[in-house]
Amino acid sequence: MWAGRRAWHCGDVLVRPVPDNAVAAWSAGVLDGLQVEGLRLAHPVRSSDGRWVVAGWAASRYVPGVLEPRYDAVIEAANRLHAATAELTRPRVLDGRDDLLARSAAAAWGERRLSLDPATGGTLYAELAAYRTAVQVTPQVVHAELFGAVLFDGDVPALVDLVPAWRPKEWAAAVVVVDALAWGGADDTLPHRWAHLDEWPQMLLRAALYRLALHAQHPEASARTLPGLERAAGLVTALL
């Protein structure tokens, strides 16, 4: 296991299975040429015939580090990453996606209606969705799953992958906050420390809706796994 992911470490290379070959190949192509000041990247490694993905497997350089509850530093890393990805065009691999993450994000942004189990978050989702209002923010390529993707080994954090979404950078930061509140033991003041970001209350709301929609659809979710998101939702609601 590496950063919570199934992977095999051999020398300075990590080999791991990927859930989507097309997305993994696109992400590898971006990370291969990306340089982000103040952020170490797990650069991808090609196969002997030049491919990024072979039969559902990909490889990257090993970057040392461990997960730490340094959530402000994770958001700072996110902001640096998204400054570097701001000029990327919308990837075609996102077109027509209907996986759990894509459905949940579309629902959170009011682009799709989902039938969600009330017992695993559907009721809370409906309550929060009533607070959603229009926003003026710009979508770009962002990392949609940064919580658990940033490692620390000294002062310079490391990014282990790139899970692309076409959403505002403020939303990606808000997802980190919601995850940290729900599952990372973050203190109640974390959302307030990033209140200078554009449309912040609504970005937090959409991040909470995203996680609630995902939780309510997840096959392993239950009422017992919901309290963390209930805590996060309560703190987000207080800012609306």
Give short role names for the model-derived ranges.
Residues 214-240:
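ATP/Mg2+ or Mg2+-diphosphate-binding catalytic cores
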Residues 61:
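Conserved Hanks-type protein kinase catalytic core
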